[in-house]
């Protein structure tokens, strides 16, 4: 059975205090506190690397989702990547089973929600060179309550190019600038309550920014993309009286 789509947008890495074990010149930890995957953090040396979040005294972070983008974890031979939590910064426990990244593309994984003061992403020793990481997401995710409508294509792409023509209009050549992912998805039979409590808060706080998108994390965990709303518009028309609909066009750089 397929999983329903989810997005991960409310990133606690942007809100809590962040500390890195080491920093390479030109790759500060502050690069992780936005949504730009081309600005990355990188450590130094060959020892264990880690990134730690601290919610602060008397505060906690609730996390149920880990997202990574703009990284080279697989290429650098990282194994047993771990996400841990703690309440005292001394005793650490696994949020999920440590895993070996199978790709340098987007990674998104969910786990039973944990609420604690500290969280830490641990890169064990044994890598080829210190890996880079552009986006670290930690927080909760927003699940869509229904499946996409018939006709959904998770693989939509468009090539951005520049063409050179002769004076007579003949094609001399085409240069590809980049390939962007463009995904159109429609949802029907959405409850008004979900629209009010889930989609409207997302749109109000995050409608202009990128987010992680996974259309079927259960069967297609490799199809995780960092996307944004092509047209940040809030439109959820009623259908059949009591249900609402949502039509989205999502775009981002095709990795």
Identify the role of each PLM range.
Residues 1-50, 54-80, 89-255:
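Extracellular/virion structural assembly segments
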């Amino acid at each position: 059975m397929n999983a329903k789509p989810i997005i991960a947008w409310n990133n606690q890495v942007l809100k809590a205090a962040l500390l890195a074990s080491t920093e390479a010149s030109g790759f500060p930890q502050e690069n992780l506190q936005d949504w730009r995957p081309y600005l990355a953090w990188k450590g130094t040396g060959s020892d264990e690397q880690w990134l730690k979040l601290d919610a602060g005294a008397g505060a906690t972070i609730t996390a149920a989702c880990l997202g990574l983008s703009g990284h080279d974890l697989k290429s650098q031979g990282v194994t047993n990547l771990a996400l841990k939590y703690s309440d005292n910064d001394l005793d650490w426990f696994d949020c999920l089973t440590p895993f070996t990244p199978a790709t340098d593309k987007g990674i998104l994984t969910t786990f039973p929600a944990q609420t604690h003061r500290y969280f830490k992403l641990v890169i064990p020793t044994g890598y080829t060179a210190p890996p880079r990481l552009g986006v670290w997401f930690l927080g909760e995710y927003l699940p869509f309550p229904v499946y996409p409508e018939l006709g959904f294509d998770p693989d939509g792409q468009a090539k951005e190019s520049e063409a050179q023509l002769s004076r007579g209009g003949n094609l001399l050549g085409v240069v590809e600038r980049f390939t962007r992912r463009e995904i159109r998805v429609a949802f029907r039979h959405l409850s008004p309550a979900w629209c009010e409590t889930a989609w409207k808060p997302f749109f109000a706080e995050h409608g202009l920014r990128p987010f992680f998108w996974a259309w079927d994390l259960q069967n297609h965990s490799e199809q995780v993309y960092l996307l944004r709303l092509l047209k940040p518009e809030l439109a959820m028309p009623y259908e059949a009286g009591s249900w609402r609909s949502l039509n989205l066009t999502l775009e981002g750089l095709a990795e």
